[in-house]
Curated annotation (Swiss-Prot):
Keywords: Chaperone, Membrane, Transmembrane, Transmembrane helix. This is DnaJ homolog subfamily C member 25. It comes from the Eukaryota. The keyword Transmembrane applies. It is a multi-pass membrane protein. The chain crosses the membrane at residues 19-39, 147-167, 241-261. The keyword Chaperone applies. InterPro entries: DnaJ_domain, DNAJC25-like, J_dom_sf. Its main location: membrane. Residues 48-121 form the J domain. It comes from Rattus norvegicus. It is found in: Membrane.
Amino acid sequence: MAARLAWRRGPGAAGQRPWLLLAPLLLVPLLVRPAEALVEGLYCGTRDCYEVLGVSRSASKAEIARAYRQLARRYHPDRYRPEPGDGPGGAPPSAEAFLLVATAYETLKDEETRKDYDYMLDHPEEYYSHYYHYYSRRLAPKVDVRVVILVSVCAISVFQYFSWWNSYNKSISYLATVPKYRIQATEIAKEQGLLKKAKEKGKNKKSKEEIRDEEENIIKNIIKSKIDIKGGYQKPQVRDLLLFQVLLAPVHLCSYIAWYCRWVYNFNIKGKEYGEEERLYIIRKSMKMSQSQFDSLEDHQKEMFLKRELWIKENYEVYKQEQEEELKKKLANDPRWKRYRRWMKNEGPGRLTFVDD
């Protein structure tokens, strides 16, 4: 029975053994690497770049450049005259000779590429590693990242500058249409006699449209000089551009560290009372407002903040709750908000269903 059992197992085991032996054989071509250092498609191909230029591996950059210039003049397509047995390093005389010389020079003139090439000559067994280093350098971007960053920052700064000027001019045009500011600017222009000069008739008679445009420009210029616009529509400042912010970042960082150290020493360690500037700073941080937003507030609002002592956390929480209640009352009396609530109550938002009507 043991012999019969062995006979029954024999065909199954014998059927599996060829597949087990065949699997390693299929992986052999993938693991086999060429033993030769010179590989077709890498650097100078099957030619030694040093032999192509006629220099040794210890040659300096100057010697490599000198050898390249001599061979380039000799094998340049415009000057090349084929002769029997002529060619760099014994290469056949053809138009490929000049390309081979140029490739050898490009390989050896760069220190990093030359190191990779020398490493390939010394370690021919690392076949796939040589391919990786060769194509990683060829496909790497040639442009310096620092130049790209600098150009991008300059482009953003230029866009910021013109965009801010456009917003500022729009704000001036809007203020010129507001009766309050327009009447004041017109009175100032009359006092200075600017409107009379615009209407004076000289040798070149002006049309009504030209006079109107000139008066409009006078009013806008007075508004620019008399009104200090703050916030997002303020007059553009060069120091606010991204380029100057990046350049001045170390200065701002040092000044912030010095300010923070003074704050900790004066108020946390010595326990001094806050001044008006420090109180407004704490209030602004509690309200989560930027400096430009806080500066755009009216003076009476800031005085109210100081009067209510909003730099104290408990007082600010009470003020915040009051503002939320006031906002709810305004929304409750707002006709548009009432219509929205009525619509939500009667119809509600649309629903997506898959039930066939």
